[in-house]
Amino acid sequence: MLQKLFRISTIPDSLEILLKGQLKMLSEYYEVVAVSSPGEKMKVLEEREGVRTVSIPMERRISLVKDFISLLRLIVLFAKERPDMVHSITPKAGLLSMLAAWITRVPVRMHTFTGLVFPTATGKMQKLLIAMDRLTCFCATHINPEGEGVKRDLVNYNITSKPLHIIANGNV
């Protein structure tokens, strides 16, 4: 029986564009499930990559009520499906899925930072975004910055003290 890997993004475009061909390749070694907000791209992913998809609405902007509902849906999904690994990209999907995976004790919880929002924010918003990224890292077992610039910011802003691993040569 193959280990179950969930790949998660806030919007399906991220899975469809950034991971083009990767899900299909990974499905040779894992039972891959793509999780993202509903949309036509989910059907494209299912057909092109040959993986199962699950739609869970997630807002890109901060929305406490909708974010809480998305978190609960992810918790229910993980409790039911019992994935071996959860690997997220995009900030909101990272926060929600790492928290849900931590709560449901998924053994491998990986987040790839494909960019950071907080360096361009100011004041209370920057502090909130930093806190969110720190929580994402706290809940993750593995953290992958997409390149040296993102890695440098994660270190300089003290987001995490966990090891940071750039995949291959970086830059998604």
Give a label for each model feature:
Residues 77-84:
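Glycine-rich phosphate-binding loop signature in dinucleotide/nucleotide-binding domains
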Residues 14-19, 65-72, 107-108, 117-139:
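Nucleotide-sugar donor phosphate/pyrophosphate-binding loop at the beta->alpha transition
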Residues 40-44, 139-172:
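A short, active-site helix/loop in glycosyltransferases that binds the activated sugar's phosphate group
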Residues 28-66, 161-168:
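Conserved nucleotide-sugar phosphate-binding/catalytic loop shared by glycosyltransferases and other
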Residues 3-9, 101-116, 144:
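Active-site proximal beta-strand in glycosyltransferases
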Residues 88-94:
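Short His-centered aromatic/hydrophobic patch
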Residues 1-37, 49-51:
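N-terminal subdomain of nucleotide-sugar transferases
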